[in-house]
Amino acid sequence: MANFPASLLILNGKSADNQPLREAITLLRDEGIQIHVRVTWEKGDAQRYVDEARRLGVETVIAGGGDGTINEVSTALIQIRDGVAPALGLLPLGTANDFATSAGIPEALDKALKLAIAGNAMEIDMARVNDKTCFINMATGGFGTRITTETPEKLKAALGGVSYLIHGLMRMDTLTPDRCEIRGENFHWQGDTLVIGIGNGRQAGGGQQLCPTALVNDGLLQLRIFTGEELLPALFSTLTQSDDNPNIIDDASAWFDIHAPHEITFNLDGEPLSGQEFHIEVLPGALRCRLPPDCPLLR
């Protein structure tokens, strides 16, 4: 692998003391691969490190962390207007790793690193909300969003993605639907919803397949609505297929407009955004990402 160009790894500070990762990086460096490592401490660090990556002339910026870290790095990359932006590499180190998991990124650190450095760079889409905030994986709204934002950090650290499900079951007594109106290309729906998923990727909340047919290079976003009736069949798709469940509504569009009579919150790759009006649009081919050749998110 010594012939491959240099990379810069932007590592979430929570993973800075990961000894297996240190060993994997050392082994690659011993093979002649140049890997710069930078650790984030506060919001805005990812943007500064992407700027540094351009000055260093690296061809890949690797996001080492969970969906939030991937979001920060990818958002910084698509801001580059002059010249060719570095490709994005993925190193899943977070609690849920929903985007990396659905993309088929290896769990083994050494294999994930090699893919991030030497894999083929594919053009993929991103999405933007209200002309400002971006996401690479999914925007989720409703009860599911409240659960992911309220799940205690200690529970997430101990149990990983299943912690969201456990915390959700503990909060069933507080469950209330959100009323909203959603429009897209040739689509209009209005009613009460428990969960809204608008996906560039397929899963959120620690492995829940909210948008199971989403692709990252088709110029579309997939919508899934769980209406505010028959809670358990709607929330847990293991109990019924969506084709058999009238309380699950699917659509696909390059954009969606959402209006609510009261404030609702969307979770964008882990970052909450509250309001009553949301315009969500796809950004086709917004960045290049190193993905496995059999990546299920590619058409």
From Swiss-Prot:
Gene3D superfamilies from the UniProt entry: 2.60.200.40, Probable inorganic polyphosphate/atp-NAD kinase, domain 1 (3.40.50.10330)
EC number of this enzyme: 2.7.1.-
Keyword Metal-binding: yes
Cofactor note: Binds 1 Mg(2+) ion per subunit. Ca(2+) may be able to substitute.
Binding residues annotated for ATP, in chain numbering: T40, G66, D67, G68, T69, I70, N71, E72, T95
GO aspect biological process, one term: phospholipid biosynthetic process
Cofactor(s) annotated in UniProt: Mg(2+); Ca(2+)
Keyword set, alphabetical order: ATP-binding, Cytoplasm, Kinase, Lipid biosynthesis, Lipid metabolism, Magnesium, Metal-binding, Nucleotide-binding, Phospholipid biosynthesis, Phospholipid metabolism, Transferase
Pfam families: DAGK_cat, YegS_C
Example GO molecular function: magnesium ion binding
Described function: Probably phosphorylates lipids; the in vivo substrate is unknown.
Annotated family: Belongs to the diacylglycerol/lipid kinase family. YegS lipid kinase subfamily.
The name this protein goes by in its record: Probable lipid kinase YegS
